Swiss-Prot record:
Protein name according to UniProt: Uncharacterized protein ECU02_0010/ECU04_1710
Polar residues bias spans: 175-201
Species for this entry: Encephalitozoon cuniculi (strain GB-M1)
Regions of compositional bias (Low complexity) in chain numbering: 206-220
Region (Disordered): 98-148, 172-220
Length: 220
């Protein structure tokens, strides 16, 4: 008895989905040329299917081995997907510094999954994460640096004190350490000429005190 196959009356017949994993097709010439110079195409062993792990560090000028693109499609990426504007949009869009680890049993329903590594080379690499799970409030921001205004004012004031001889007077009063001062007489001149104590007191009083600041310092 002859068996005849009835034609499908569906307007758009769809083929039956294969349950087996298809073989990896040959790479695009652009990918194969880049793969010879840099091992940037890898197949993760812990993922099902045949995705392509594309490291865009050689294409993205903003990513220094910190971004990777995992394509779940069963075909090699088109050359348009490897153009710099499309491969750099992850760096231009978000800067993820503290990625959250996704559950191991999680399945990605999207077509693309991003593997983002922390920019610090000493820190361990982050696992596969979703870019839509991070918000601006969840980004780790560095601690604000200490105010450099006080430090700059301190340096400015110390320079004014040193230029006006305030540091010399302070060192002579507290530490009794000889400090080079062009206005102060040298030890040789003191040994030959012994001035009166009243003259020394008048000189000390004529110099500005530690508490008196110039007008430029008081304006600060």
């Amino acid at each position: 008895m002859e068996q005849r196959q009835l034609p499908c009356n569906h307007p758009n017949p769809t083929p039956r989905l294969r349950t087996s994993v298809p073989a990896i097709p040959p790479l695009h010439p652009q990918l194969s040329s880049l793969a010879t110079s840099h091992p940037w195409i890898q197949k993760p062993s812990h993922l099902k299917g045949s995705p392509y792990l594309l490291s865009i560090s050689s294409l993205c000028p903003l990513a220094t081995s910190s971004c990777a693109l995992l394509v779940h499609s069963q075909h090699p990426p088109r050359p348009s997907e490897l153009s710099p504007p499309l491969s750099c949009f992850l760096c231009q869009k978000e800067t993820l510094t503290s990625p959250r680890p996704s559950p191991p049993s999680h399945h990605c329903p999207e077509s693309l999954t991003y593997q983002v590594h922390q920019p610090n080379p000493k820190s361990p690499s982050g696992p596969l994460v979703h870019s839509n799970r991070f918000k601006a409030s969840e980004r780790r921001r560095p601690n604000p640096p200490t105010s450099s205004l006080k430090l700059s004012c301190h340096i400015l004031l110390s320079g004014i004190w040193r230029s006006n001889g305030f540091i010399t007077m302070k060192d002579k009063r507290n530490n009794n350490t000889p400090v080079s001062n062009p206005e102060a007489p040298s030890s040789d001149s003191l040994s030959h000429s012994t001035p009166n104590s009243s003259n020394l007191q008048e000189k000390a009083l004529s110099r500005p005190s530690l508490t008196s600041f110039p007008s430029s310092v008081s304006s600060i």
